[in-house]
């Protein structure tokens, strides 16, 4: 089974999975006066934040011509390579603003994209965007194939033993690996001064044969010892 990630909402979950999984040489700007970054005013109309999908974070400038490096929180390359409107959220703000993606490319071996955003024409402007998050509307979520799931849909699902129906715990994260791993917070009382125990469960059909998004239920058939292996406090 495969997980696909477009992180949802303005708050970022730990980005190791992020829908998770570009050289540059820019033009010098000489003595030209630097422009401000073209981020629209906070009065621009925006959708409800709960309906946004986070797709990446701007981590640095690239070259001198205004390109930015983006760490992807999405498994869909078209988020970064197909021109069109994206939504940008500055640190400290609560509403993202529309900005146009002109073009983008992938940086091999770095897990980064290089994007050119409309109106960002020099390194000063691109440096001002460091730390900004990129979003698309949740209505733009791509259709997935059989046995593919969005990470945001898996988070919070309850996990049960298929044989007994006993509750194992709740999915709190999805960790990318050769086979993705569900990080499950075990359903058991713990002292108030201790963190809940968690366990990593391979997200493969042999171990997680039932994934029911409507009932928010995952049924597992773990091999002996799996639920104890790697658990901690």
Curated annotation (Swiss-Prot):
Keywords: Chaperone, Cytoplasm, Ribosome biogenesis, rRNA processing
Subcellular location: Cytoplasm
GO process terms (BP): ribosomal small subunit biogenesis; rRNA processing
Region (Disordered): 1-51
GO terms under cellular component: cytoplasm; ribosome
Domain PRC barrel: 145-226
Quaternary structure and interacting proteins, as annotated: Binds ribosomal protein uS19.
Entries under PANTHER family matching the protein: RIBOSOME MATURATION FACTOR RIMM
Role summary: An accessory protein needed during the final step in the assembly of 30S ribosomal subunit, possibly for assembly of the head region. Essential for efficient processing of 16S rRNA. May be needed both before and after RbfA during the maturation of 16S rRNA. It has affinity for free ribosomal 30S subunits but not for 70S ribosomes.
Stated name of the protein: Ribosome maturation factor RimM
Organism: Trichormus variabilis (strain ATCC 29413 / PCC 7937)
């Amino acid at each position: 089974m495969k997980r696909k990630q477009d992180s949802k909402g303005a708050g970022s979950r730990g980005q190791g999975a992020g829908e998770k999984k570009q050289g540059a040489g820019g033009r010098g700007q000489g003595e030209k006066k630097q422009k401000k970054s073209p981020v629209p005013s906070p009065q621009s109309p925006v959708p409800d934040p709960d309906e946004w999908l986070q797709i990446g974070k701007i981590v640095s400038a690239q070259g001198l011509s205004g390109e930015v490096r983006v760490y992807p929180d999405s498994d869909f390359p078209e988020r970064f390579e197909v021109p069109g409107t994206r939504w940008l959220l500055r640190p400290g703000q609560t509403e993202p603003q529309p900005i146009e993606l002109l073009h983008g490319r992938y940086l091999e071996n770095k897990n980064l994209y290089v994007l050119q955003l409309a109106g960002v024409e020099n390194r000063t402007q691109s440096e001002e965007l460091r730390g900004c998050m990129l979003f698309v509307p949740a209505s733009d979520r791509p259709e997935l194939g059989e046995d593919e799931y969005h990470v945001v849909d898996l988070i919070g699902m309850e996990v049960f033993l298929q044989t007994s129906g006993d509750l194992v715990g709740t999915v709190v994260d999805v960790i990318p690996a050769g086979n993705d791993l569900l990080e499950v917070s075990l359903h058991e009382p713990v002292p108030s001064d201790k963190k809940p125990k968690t366990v990593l469960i391979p997200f493969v059909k042999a171990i997680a044969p039932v994934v029911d998004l409507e009932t928010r239920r995952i049924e597992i058939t773990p091999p002996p010892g799996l639920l104890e292996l790697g658990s901690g406090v």
